[in-house]
Curated annotation (Swiss-Prot):
Record field: transmembrane: 488-508, 548-568
Record region (Leucine-zipper): 374-396
Biological source species: Sus scrofa (Pig)
Intervals, Cytoplasmic compartment: 1-487, 569-1151
Keyword Glycoprotein in record: no
Pfam families xrefs: HLH
Biased composition (Low complexity): 57-69, 431-448, 995-1006
Molecular function, one GO term: DNA binding
The name this protein goes by in its record: Sterol regulatory element-binding protein 1
Signal peptide feature range: none
């Protein structure tokens, strides 16, 4: 400290000298102060002095202290703050006011005006800081006066409570002993030190925030006597001694004073007369918790760091009241809770949906469970990806492995990868400097750590966690097989070699000498010398040449067959990568089939075949090659050569495991081909007839090669599908192949199991075989909406053909009853009824084995091996059988079928067509009138007939142009109702013996209600006869009955009965063609109809219409003989009773 002391004369000289600040700087400072004045209203009570009673202080109510409401300082103060700083005169500003120098006054301590209400973590203590005298007086540069501050020992920090506010343990205080408010140099009065400026700085340290806040204000005032000079300073830094304060984190902030309130600063020093002091703020450096006082510096708040501004804002906001703090805290908490609730609601919508109602705990629990499920799924997928990637890497070459794994990057630890996987994935070191072990994991880590360029960054490699693959599970080199076009090219090459036989030509030209060699041995320029042929000529070569050529050709053919069937056939080993991919696609296809997504199922089956190394043809050339190869292969397998070689696929050596794998692979491929063929047949898979034929042949060839790996039922189903393809796609001239495939299916079943599957037994029946081969039917893609049977499996064409056959049997049985064949054998017995019952019995057996239920969509399942039922077809068959038994007057057989007919199936109950209800009510009415049970009353029976008639009329009106089976069923029901009404009429009013003997029909008239119902049913029968000609012969008989019931003129009745009794002779002589045409238009009556007409004529016609007196008895006798042959026991009983009345107890026997 060798500088001269700072004297009062030097201070006056420095203040008197003109300032070197230019006009621009002055203008900026004025603008800054004006800004401070404008913003002063933001903190009106910032520098108020609410505390009094400090030692050495003055009363806040004294005249020296300005009131808070005064807008301007008193007149004794300087004209402007700038003049107080500069102390010199300028041209624009007024001259400075030179204050008088009063006598030195004792030092007074004033408390610093707090910027905000102190909180519990703030401690206030006034700290006097003494500024030593500088060595030499220097002129003031601008508004700042540099000073030399000697370093003193750092004072001890003592946490003492001030102003009634408790101090927390972690707070800091100024270096003032407890109980003292100011500190001066010991032993010296402050006034006796000229040139010394004693300043007391009030320090506030806040330690509640992470960064401690140090706020201080120091306003030196030149005071003559009681004159107070108020300095208003914006951004006043702390003036500290050059000592170190240890703190965790301190931040120096600035404060501003109230422009309208002159406040006395704490720690005003007394100056000698003539001295002027200007405040020199010092900027402190904060680094590592240590504060060091350095050169004074004023920092603009606009250029402060954000953290300092935030800290200052926090300091200002902490001065609010406790209520405002609580309100702000509540608002923050409300926003926090609202944010949490929004996120929980969003989480609930993601996990359980928007409609669910759960509390927060349940939502979090559900989210945790879902996250665990996703983690487990992710783990499984990673393991599966690992196995697939491992197999892919193992199958690649070294170059491909290095190229695909050198740029990869992964963060998976090496302990998650098994050693065999690392050995497989690690190529050998390429140079001497490379490490001995290298893997995609290590390569990725080196690549990521060594370079920083963007070219080295590659996509992340898959996570290798675990591998269950074993070396013996990998596919064999020959597992891929040959393509069909390669096979066909090899076949064509061998065929050309065998047909052209170039080997024989080559061997012949090599073995046999040429013509010139046989005649001359040497050709000179002038003459030729004939050579002599040796005695042992090439005869043995000529003898050995043909066998050698054929042996060589045979070896070539065997080699060709071995390449095609043994080494060219793809074999999939279990647990290999192709097997894993195949089963994945196949299981997905099963799920798609069960879901009804047939297009996606076909796509999965296509991918499954590709995984097995048997891709489907994608072009016309590939399709032609594949079809020709399958034809050639099928022919070779029929010769047992191809089947024997195909059983050795994979190698000629005998290996039981390899043979089993070969059969299993062929079985899997055959099932997929067969299912694709079924989907194509049902219209679920696109493609033409050639594609379908190729699929059928591929399935058939592989099924024959599968052997015992494929069940007998599936093999028979494949044969039947091939026969169905011949029936559908090939022309009629080639339909004989259908018999061949059906015979092969039957032989395969009988050879292995000795029985035919239940769902295919109808194909072995002559009627079923004839229907399949010669029937005019077609398979449609959409399920058939039939009233007489239920559809089976929608993806099985055989189930649809079986449904068509059941309806065909029902139709044949109805035609046998409604339209029997008028052959010569029909008079020998009940042929029409026996044939109908035979068809119905076969129909019942087919209904019991209707095929698999519609829900079995598995590819491996066979519809032929499982049995189902067809309740709809069974109900119609039972109803037809009951009606047939009624018409044959066999009540015992009909009663056994009553329980099956009484309950209508649910499918028919839900049907909108009235025909099933008409059939049910007709059955009930006929059972009441024709059965052996207790007879119902006339009114009840008539009511049931009327109800059945109403449903039947609705059915006739709804289907005017229905199918032949609908018309046959309507004819059967109409006839049944008319027969029931006739029986009701005969039961109520039987002809008495006198009227029967006289032939009078006047007494047997029915009621008007009965006649009205009979006429309605008869009109329905006439309407049906217009479109269905077999109903015409029943119209004549029932019309005659209606006239008899009404008592009409017997002449027309006799004509109608005569048409039923007339027997037409064969066409002969003139008019034979016209008679034949008439016979075709009008069907001939059956033997039963003739017997019924004879019975009606003999019972109800008057005697005048009979030619002879004994003709009535003869007609009854003939009718009795006919009914006895037909087996109609009820009509036979009625006929015998009539003969007994007419003949005096005589009976008629068959002659």
């Amino acid at each position: 400290m060798d500088e001269p002391p700072f004297t009062e004369a030097a201070l006056e000289q420095a203040l008197a000298e003109p300032c070197e600040l230019d006009a621009a700087l002055l203008t900026d400072i004025e603008d800054m102060l004006q800004l401070i004045n404008n913003q002063d209203s933001d903190f009106p009570g910032l520098f108020d002095a609410p505390y009094a009673g400090v030692a050495g202080g003055t009363d806040p109510t004294s005249p020296d202290a300005s009131s808070p409401g005064s807008p301007t300082p008193p007149p004794s103060t300087m004209s402007s703050p700038l003049e107080g700083f500069l102390g010199g005169a300028r041209t624009p500003p007024p001259p400075p006011v030179s204050p008088t120098q009063p006598a030195p006054t004792p030092l007074k301590m004033y408390p610093s005006v707090p910027a905000f209400s102190p909180g519990p973590g703030i401690k206030e203590e006034p700290v006097p800081l003494t500024i030593l005298q500088p060595p030499t007086p220097q002129p003031l540069s601008g508004a700042l006066l540099p000073q030399s501050l000697p370093a003193l020992a750092p004072p001890q920090l003592s946490p003492a409570p001030v102003l009634g506010y408790p101090s927390p343990p972690g707070s800091f205080s100024s270096a003032t002993p407890p109980g003292s408010t100011s500190q001066t140099l010991p032993g010296l009065p402050l006034a006796s030190l000229p040139g010394v400026l004693p300043v007391s700085v009030h320090t506030q340290v806040q330690s509640a925030a992470p960064q401690q806040l140090l706020t201080a204000t120091a306003t030196p005032v030149v005071s003559p006597g009681t004159t107070t000079v108020t300095s208003q300073i914006q951004q006043v830094p702390v003036l500290l001694q050059p000592h170190f304060i240890k703190a965790d984190s301190l931040l120096l902030t600035t404060m501003k004073t109230d422009m309208g309130t002159p406040v006395k600063a704490a720690g005003i020093g007394s100056l000698a007369p003539g001295t002027a002091v200007q405040a020199a703020p010092l900027q402190t450096l904060v680094s590592g918790g240590t504060i060091l006082a350095t050169v004074p510096l004023v920092v603009d708040t606009d250029k402060l760091p954000i953290n300092r501004l935030a800290a200052g804002g926090k300091a200002l906001s902490s001065g609010q009241s406790r209520g405002e703090k609580r309100t702000a805290h509540n608002a923050i908490e409300k926003r926090y809770r609202s944010s949490i609730n929004d996120k929980i609601i969003e989480l609930k919508d993601l996990v359980v949906g928007t409609e669910a109602k759960l509390n927060k705990s349940a939502v979090l629990r559900k989210a945790i469970d879902y996250i665990r499920f996703l983690q487990q799924s992710n783990q499984k997928l990673k393991q599966e990806n690992l196995s697939l990637r491992t197999a892919a890497h193992k199958s690649k070459s070294l170059k491909d492995l290095v190229s695909c794994s050198s740029g990869g990057r992964t963060d998976v630890p090496m302990e998650g990868v098994k050693p065999e996987v690392v050995d497989t994935l690690s190529p050998p070191p390429s140079d001497a400097g490379s490490p001995s072990q290298s893997s995609p994991l290590s390569l990725g880590s080196r690549g990521s750590s060594s370079g920083g360029s963007g070219s080295d960054s590659e996509p992340d490699s898959p996570v290798f966690e675990d591998s269950q693959m074993k070396p013996e599970q990998l596919p064999a080199p020959h597992g891929r097989g040959m393509l069909d076009r390669s096979r066909l090219a090899l076949c064509v090459l061998v065929f050309l070699c065998l047909s052209c036989n170039p080997l024989a030509s080559l061997m012949g030209s090599w073995a046999l000498p040429g013509p010139s060699d046989a005649t001359s041995a040497y050709h000179g320029p002038w003459r030729s010398v004939l050579g002599a042929e040796g005695r042992d000529g090439p005869g043995w070569v000529l003898w050995l040449l043909p066998p050698l050529v054929w042996l060589t050709n045979g070896l070539l053919v065997l080699l060709f067959l071995a390449l095609l069937f043994v080494y060219g056939e793809p074999v999939t080993r279990p647990h290999s990568d192709p097997a894993v991919r195949f089963w994945r696609h196949r299981k997905q296809a099963d799920l798609d089939l069960a879901r009804g997504d047939f297009a996606q199922a076909a796509q999965q089956l296509w991918l499954a075949l590709r995984a097995l190394g048997r891709p489907l043809p994608t072009s016309h050339l590939d399709l032609a090659c594949s079809l020709l190869w399958n034809l050639i292969r099928h022919l070779l397998q029929r010769l047992w050569v191809g089947r024997w070689l195909a059983g050795r696929a994979g190698g000629l050596r005998r290996d039981s495991a390899l043979e089993a794998d070969t059969r299993t692979s062929a079985c899997d491929a055959a099932l997929v081909y067969h299912k694709l063929h079924q989907l194509h047949t049902m219209g679920k898979y696109p493609g033409g007839h050639l594609d379908a034929a190729n699929l059928a042949l591929s399935a058939l060839n592989l099924a024959e090669c599968a052997g015992d790996a494929l069940s007998v039922a599936v093999l028979a189903e494949v044969y039947v599908a091939a026969a169905l393809r011949v029936k559908t796609s090939l022309p009629r001239a080639l339909h004989f192949l259908t018999r061949f495939f059906l015979s092969s299916a039957r032989q395969a079943c009988l050879a292995q199991s000795g029985s035919v599957p239940v769902a295919m037994q109808w194909l072995c029946h002559p009627v079923g075989h004839r229907f399949f081969v010669d029937g005019d039917w077609a398979v449609c893609g959409a399920p058939r909406d039939s009233l007489y049977s239920v559809a089976g499996n929608p993806v099985d064409p055989l189930a649809q053909v079986t449904q068509l056959f059941r309806e065909h049997l029902l139709e044949q049985a109805l035609h046998c009853v409604a339209q029997p064949s008028p052959g010569p054998g029909s008079a020998d017995g009940d042929r029409e009824f026996s044939e109908a019952l035979g068809f119905l019995q076969l129909l019942n057996s087919c209904c019991d084995t209707a095929g698999a239920p519609a829900c079995s969509f598995s590819i491996a399942s066979s519809t032929a091996a499982t049995a189902g039922t067809d309740p709809v077809a069974k109900w119609w068959a039972s109803l037809t059988a009951v009606v047939t038994h009624w018409l044959g007057r066999d009540e015992e057989a009909a009663e056994r079928l009553y329980p099956l007919v009484e309950h209508l199936p649910r499918a028919l109950q839900e049907s909108e067509r009235p025909l099933p209800r008409a059939a049910l009510h007709s059955f009930k009415a006929a059972r009441a009138l024709l059965g052996r049970g207790k007879a119902e009353s006339g009114s009840a029976s008539l009511a049931m007939c009327e109800k059945a008639s109403g449903y039947l009329q609705d059915s006739l009106a709804a289907t005017p142009a229905g199918s032949s089976i609908d018309k046959a069923m309507q004819l059967l029901l109409c006839d049944l109702l008319l027969v029931a009404r006739t029986s009701l009429w005969q039961r109520q009013k039987p002809p008495p013996p006198s009227q029967a003997s006289q032939g009078s029909s006047s007494g047997a008239q029915a009621s008007a209600l009965e006649l009205r119902g009979f006429q309605r049913d008869l009109s329905g029968l006439r309407r049906l006869a217009q479109s269905f000609r077999p109903a015409m012969r029943r119209v004549f008989l029932h019309e005659a009955t209606a006239r008899l019931m009404a008592g009409a003129s017997p002449a027309r009745t006799h004509q109608l009965l005569d048409r039923s009794l007339r027997r037409r002779a064969g066409p002969c002589g003139r008019g034979g063609a016209a008679a034949a045409a008439a016979a075709e238009l009008e069907p001939r009556p059956t033997r039963r109809e003739q017997a019924e007409a004879l019975l009606l004529a003999s019972c109800y016609l008057p005697p005048g219409f009979l030619s002879a007196p004994g003709q009535r008895v003869g007609m009854l006798a003939e009718a009795a003989r006919t009914l006895e042959k037909l087996g109609d026991r009820r009509l036979l009983h009625d006929c015998q009773q009539m003969l007994m009345r007419l003949g005096g107890g005589t009976t008629v026997t068959s002659s």
